[in-house]
Amino acid sequence: MTAPHTAPARVAVLGGTGFIGRVLGARLLAQGAEVLSLARKAPAEPAPGRFVAFDLSNGDPAELTALLDRERIDTVVNAAGGMWGLNDEQMYQANVVLTERLIEAVAAMASPARLVHLGTVHEYGMAPVGTSQRESDPAAPVMEYGKLKLAATEAVVRAVEAGRISGVVLRLGNVVGAGQPGHSLLGVMAAKLDAARAAGETAQLSLQPLTALRDFVDLTDTLDAVLLAAADRSAPPVVNVGTGSASTARHLVELLIEESGVPTEITEVPAPDGTGPETEWQQLDVTVARDSLGWTPRRTLREAVRELWTAQSTAPVA
């Protein structure tokens, strides 16, 4: 049996070309780990470590088992999945089927790796304003993405409780940091501010009310939690990772404008009918992360937004 606290040395990152996966891979490399980045297709920019194109949502788990054994992988991080640009069936394949096949692949390894699966706060669904969601609270998501992520989490938990694998699900808040996806609200706003900066113009931003409160968490803090969860096999099966406080997306956009220093004119626009948020409130209780992993959020949302802006404004022009 692997010691409870063993730093990962040979790590496979599914979704290794994505927002979290790419930065995680780079950090692992910097810490001396060997990294195998896996994704459906080769990225435009090289992924951290060695890259292998592998679409597990349509692939054979036995092939992945053979690859993981051959690479002597001791930790697998599932940063794959998603919702943007996908229909319900594609989301099911990318989130549920992929996770089930990953569990099968890891369980069949000659020396099964530790699995760290990245879940989401959206698995909780509706929550009363002012409350903090605990891992033991009933999860009742309304939106399809939350339902599918919950199904993936439940598959991991079942496998852990049955002794098939050593694993943990990190239920992440809304992660903010360098490399923010361009289709996200902050990614879109950062791109518009950067375009105005480059042109020497005033940025013109149209903003909906954005009054729903969310638990946003810094990317670097998130990576800290991933590494701690990978190293500690005694952690409980589900652990929340967030700041433990709720903020509006509007607040983060305002922080982004301040950090950019770009003159900005804001036009207030109503939200389209039928596009309201799943819930007006998300706030994670992170007590379990503190007690089981020794993790607490250290960085402010301003620091997270600052890193987002620095990465956006210094990126080479495509």
Swiss-Prot record:
GO molecular function annotation: dTDP-6-deoxy-L-talose 4-dehydrogenase activity
Catalyzed reactions: dTDP-6-deoxy-beta-L-talose + NAD(+) = dTDP-4-dehydro-beta-L-rhamnose + NADH + H(+); dTDP-6-deoxy-beta-L-talose + NADP(+) = dTDP-4-dehydro-beta-L-rhamnose + NADPH + H(+)
Purpose: Catalyzes the reduction of dTDP-6-deoxy-L-lyxo-4-hexulose to dTDP-6-deoxy-L-talose. Can use NAD(+) or NADP(+).
Official protein name in the record: dTDP-6-deoxy-L-talose 4-dehydrogenase (NAD(P)(+))
Residue sites binding substrate per the record: T120, Y145
Catalytic-site annotation from UniProt: Y145 (proton acceptor)
Signal sequence residues: none
Highest taxon in the source lineage: Bacteria
InterPro entries found in the cross-reference section: Epimerase_deHydtase, NAD(P)-bd_dom_sf
Top class in the EC scheme: oxidoreductase
NAD is among the record's keywords: yes
Species whose genome carries this gene: Kitasatospora kifunensis
Binding site for NAD(+): F19, I20, D60, P61, N95, T120, Y145, K149
Family: Belongs to the NAD(P)-dependent epimerase/dehydratase family.
EC id: 1.1.1.344
Keywords: NAD, NADP, Oxidoreductase
